[in-house]
Amino acid sequence: MAIPKIASYPLPVSLPTNKVDWRIDASRAVLLIHDMQEYFVHYFDSQAEPIPSLIKHIQQLKAHAKQAGIPVVYTAQPANQDPAERALLSDFWGPGLSEETAIIAPLAPESGDVQLTKWRYSAFKKSPLLDWLRETGRDQLIITGVYAHIGILSTALDAFMFDIQPFVIGDGVADFSLSDHEFSLRYISGRTGAVKSTQQACLEIAAQHSKLTGLSLRTMQHDVAAALNLSVDEVDVQENLLFLGLDSIRAIQLLEKWKAQGADISFAQLMEHVTLQQWWQTIQANLHQPCSA
């Protein structure tokens, strides 16, 4: 009834051919780190493949996502679930977690990351994920984590049903076995989403801001903090900057600085939505640079 101990296997090198030609768009995407909790990861040998490579690949993706202003969302199941709440899951997997609920240390959430409680296979079920995606105007989901043929596949299916493009990272997920892993990727690539390697995903993300010289959401946050004589921690990327004291003169000064670094954004666009997150999304959307795989 419990999750079986998982034998070591290598992450697949050859990925299935996608039926769709979707590309990751940093202004539309969210990175999901799915169920990378100590409880689930401990069924693997953490010193043997696929875990070392899986962790490295998710770290690489997260670094690229942060640089490009892509939000990062974590899911995690709670401990000591009420049997009535857990319901049919208990028939397949027993009572669930009693401890080890934390995300593994190498992938621990950082300030600004979103953390959601997860109750079912799909990250969408009984969670605010769908509402949050719609509120933030995001309609792409980059999916990493465990287990590919259970939560990853279910989440990709639900994303597709909700008109959110799922991108499953073929070497950024792990499963009970190589055969389960490969089955999941074949199904997703042919029926419900796009499968990318970590390298492909990072290239597509990086291509969209390669025109920018040293400009990122983080550097813009520092620039705004300096202009308003605030600490960086006081500048929330989703807060209306007018409430923090931004005026048109300082907005123009910031605009000129960012244009010199390659940003394509007008003063009218700057003042239409006065948050750093929305400014960065506009800059990303205006790049119009073809993606490369």
UniProtKB/Swiss-Prot annotation:
InterPro entries: ACP-like_sf, Isochorismatase, Isochorismatase-like_dom, Isochorismatase-like_hydrls, Isochorismatase-like_sf, PP-bd_ACP. SUPFAM superfamilies: ACP-like (SSF47336), Isochorismatase-like hydrolases (SSF52499). GO terms for biological process: vibriobactin biosynthetic process. This is Vibriobactin-specific isochorismatase. The modification O-(pantetheine 4'-phosphoryl)serine is found at S248. Gene3D superfamilies: ACP-like (1.10.1200.10), Isochorismatase-like (3.40.50.850). Binds 1 phosphopantetheine covalently. Keywords: Hydrolase, Phosphopantetheine, Phosphoprotein. The keyword Zinc does not apply. Residues 211-287 form the Carrier domain. It catalyses: isochorismate + H2O = (2S,3S)-2,3-dihydroxy-2,3-dihydrobenzoate + pyruvate. Belongs to the isochorismatase family. PROSITE patterns: CARRIER (PS50075). Its EC number is 3.3.2.1. Pathway: Siderophore biosynthesis; vibriobactin biosynthesis. It comes from the Bacteria. Pfam families: Isochorismatase, PP-binding. GO terms for molecular function: isochorismatase activity. Involved in the biosynthesis of the catechol siderophore vibriobactin. Vibriobactin is a chelating compound involved in transporting iron from the bacterial environment into the cell cytoplasm. Its cofactor is pantetheine 4'-phosphate.
